[in-house]
Amino acid sequence: MTQLVELKEVCLSFDGRSVLDKVSFTLNKGKITTLVGPNGAGKSTLSKLVLGLLTPDSGQITRSRDLRVGYVPQRLYLDPTLPLTVRRFLQLGKNGRLSIEEALNRVGAEDLLDNRMQKLSGGEMQRVLLARALLVKPELLVLDEPVQGVDINGQIELYALISQLAAEFNCAVLMVSHDLHLVMASTHEVICLNRHVCCHGEPESVARHPEFARLFGRPEQEVLAVYTHHHHCDGEHHHHEPQVPVIRLPSRNQ
């Protein structure tokens, strides 16, 4: 398994307040890692460290040379009076027509090309932002709350799409969960963060961990009849109808 990013004992403080304390993990090619934790746990800050937008106070971050990174931000503010179509938005990075159309096709948003950005639904906006991230042909995808503002069916579709793209590009994925109500079954590893790494591992093992239970209570295990995700010995990712186990976490308001 090819390692793309490694964090070792990373610490970061803002105004004398510790935000991250001795955080260590790796991001590997073809592996989906989901970062969960309560508000103020340092999740978005950690993603910015991975992106190189922040520098740690101590510890070490190692990235593979010339790493191509696609990023989907937590939110995108657009002036409502700006006449910006999806086409023009994706052309801002000097991307060509064929590349833009191919990226939109990959995320199932080819019909949105001439729509105004400000008129997109939550799910449509996330697909367009994901298409933009794919234009760099990423080795690493960093997704900060990729299903924010999307209904439950749209969330499931986006999670399945992310899993499909990770397999197609054979890229690493770091996904930040903010609302904490779903962790997709296709995640290879969950990192539970509360300024430090409380626990990590496969979703089922993390859900049973005492530290996870202390932060979130005992999550209810449910089965949603949507799709299943299996990793076969041939290295391929296979989706089958109709069941997927999903760990449902308490929302931050509970």
Swiss-Prot record:
It is found in: Cell inner membrane. One of its GO terms (biological process) is response to zinc ion. SUPFAM superfamilies: P-loop containing nucleoside triphosphate hydrolases. Residues 233-254 are annotated as: Disordered. GO terms for cellular component: plasma membrane. It is a peripheral membrane protein. GO terms for molecular function: ABC-type zinc transporter activity; ATP binding; ATP hydrolysis activity. The keyword Translocase applies. ATP binds at residues 37-44. It catalyses: Zn(2+)(out) + ATP(in) + H2O(in) = Zn(2+)(in) + ADP(in) + phosphate(in) + H(+)(in). It is an enzyme of class 7 (translocase). Pfam families: ABC_tran (PF00005). NCBIfam families: PRK09544.1. Belongs to the ABC transporter superfamily. Zinc importer (TC 3.A.1.15.5) family. This is Zinc import ATP-binding protein ZnuC. It comes from Aeromonas hydrophila subsp. hydrophila (strain ATCC 7966 / DSM 30187 / BCRC 13018 / CCUG 14551 / JCM 1027 / KCTC 2358 / NCIMB 9240 / NCTC 8049). The gene is znuC.
